[in-house]
Amino acid sequence: MTRVLALPLVLVALVAANATAAERPFHSTVRPLPAQLRADLTGRFWRPGCPVSLSQLRLLTVAHWGFDGSVRIGQLVVGREYANDLRGVFRRLYDLRFPIRHMRLVDMYGPASSRPTGGDVTGSFECRQAVPSPCSGGSGTGNWSNHAYGRAIDLNPLENPYVGCGRTRNRSAARYLDRSRLRPGMVTPAVVRAFSSIGWGWGGAWTGDTKDYMHFSVSGR
């Protein structure tokens, strides 16, 4: 008689979880901005005089991993000419199981009451000036940010703060100033390589006292 060994419940659950993950291949789409999204952006995040028109932007939808180990659906508004390349980047991040905390349109563009209380929103397009280093004061540089063109992404801003002269404007991110102790959601060399594969640079590689660890862009600035 052949004996059938019963697997421990924990092992069964682990196998099932791994099977579920394996059955969820990466997927992504790119499409023009829907009418409602155009309306939501107009006035607060886009206005006449911005360096790109709404028709030059695309809605990028991607699968990504959350901090809880589940697969989620995230969305970004990005420049039309960069959308397909970014699909490849997020596929690589998915394969790395790199966690992204918040990446929904309502997190970025919704009313203040609907945004995550802790921030940490991964986003791309926003018609605004570049933000000066924490080393200096002020809220704008007088120059368009790469975000104003949809050609930059800020990835997990809490875990990857904008740092200048050893400090950051986000007090909650101060515990991530020490980049030698790697924690979930922090940018790794593999993440940098995913973006560099399409020619994008990383703010964490800037020389001098200012580093923008969240920031990836077509120009590297």
List the predicted regions and their residue ranges.
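Structured segments of extracytoplasmic/periplasmic soluble domains
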Residues: 65, 88-99, 128, 158-161, ...
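Secretory targeting and sorting signals
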Residues: 1-22
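N-terminal post-signal-peptidase region of extra-cytosolic proteins
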Residues: 41-48, 71-80, 86, 135-140
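N-terminal module-boundary/linker segments of secreted carbohydrate-active enzymes
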Residues: 21-70
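Long, contiguous hydrophobic alpha-helical segments, chiefly transmembrane helices and signal peptides
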Residues: 62, 125, 153-155
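Catalytic cores and adjacent binding grooves of peptidoglycan-active enzymes
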Residues: 137-221
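Active-site acidic/histidine clusters and adjacent loop/turn architecture
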Residues: 52-120
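Active-site-adjacent loop/helix surface patches within enzyme catalytic domains
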Residues: 104-148, 160-162
